[in-house]
Amino acid sequence: MLTDRWQARRGLVDVVGAAVAGGVRWVVLREKDLPRAERAALAADLRPILAGAGGTLVVAGPDPLGGDAAHLPAAGPYPPPRLGLVGRSCHDAAELARLTTEDYATVSPVYPSRSKPGYGPPLRPARLGGLIRLSPVPVLALGGIETPGQVRACVEAGAVGVAVLGAIMRADDPGEAAAALAIPFETPQTRHDHAATAGRRG
């Protein structure tokens, strides 16, 4: 999940907490308009939420704000900083070919994005799959992903995961939205566990 406090229906820390409870395990902290001190404080608030669920907070930009994970834009910096986890935004085969020591890439936009109107043209799953086959690192699909069906199509195209912004940030219930989007990743065992939990609640 990527953050955008301007689209969130409530406080960002609350949204992230609910999303993590719903199954999100990676959060990319954007909020690049904040002063560094405020952004670092926000990162410090979010890290324990992710850590408690075995998740990871990734900071957008080369400065990990005291952490060990960063997500870089397509244009730089090169070489990537030496951190525990480094990802990069990519949009075409040329950008994927420039990857060196990155651990993963996002490829976008897969679908038209309400968060970035006019951003595109959208790749759609077929072209996404072609780029994934060219990528030297695992790929997360990004852009306009709002339904479980879209998630499933990205996974079937070869994505190891999806990066979602608006579908969770704008949701009345971020936890419920996150859980719905996670359904395509569930195994038969996790479906059984969830059903058993629901039965006990009933």
Regions found by a protein language model. Give the residues of each.
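Non-cysteine beta-strand/loop elements that form the S-adenosyl-L-methionine
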Residues: 103-111
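Conserved N-terminal beta1-alpha1 strand-loop-helix module at the mouth
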Residues: 1-69, 79-88, 93-103, 136-139, ...
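Conserved residues at the C-terminal ends of beta-strands
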Residues: 30, 73, 108, 165
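A short acidic, helix-capping loop that chelates divalent metal ions and anchors anionic groups
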Residues: 111-117
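Charged helix-capping and loop-helix junction motifs
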Residues: 40-45, 120-128
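Short, glycine/charged-rich "phosphate-handling" switch motifs in NTP-dependent
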Residues: 160
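Active-site-adjacent loop and "lid" segments of alpha/beta metabolic enzymes
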Residues: 117-120, 141
